[in-house]
């Protein structure tokens, strides 16, 4: 789950 400019690997799948 892409959040702003970070890579969210917890909720999403690390896609940026």
From Swiss-Prot:
Q: What is its EC number?
A: 3.1.1.4
Does Secreted show up as a keyword for this record?
Answer: yes
UniProt GO molecular function: phospholipase A2 activity
- The top EC class is hydrolase
Q: Where in the cell is it found?
A: Secreted
Q: Name one GO biological process term.
A: lipid catabolic process
Q: Spell out the reaction equation it catalyses.
A: a 1,2-diacyl-sn-glycero-3-phosphocholine + H2O = a 1-acyl-sn-glycero-3-phosphocholine + a fatty acid + H(+)
Question: A single GO CC term, please?
Answer: extracellular region
Entry keyword annotation includes Hydrolase: yes
Q: In which tissues is it expressed?
A: Expressed by the venom gland.
Give the record's keywords alphabetically: Hydrolase, Lipid degradation, Lipid metabolism, Secreted
Functionally, this protein is described as follows:
PLA2 catalyzes the calcium-dependent hydrolysis of the 2-acyl groups in 3-sn-phosphoglycerides.
The name this protein goes by in its record? Phospholipase A2 1
Q: Which organism does this record belong to?
A: Opisthacanthus cayaporum (South American scorpion)
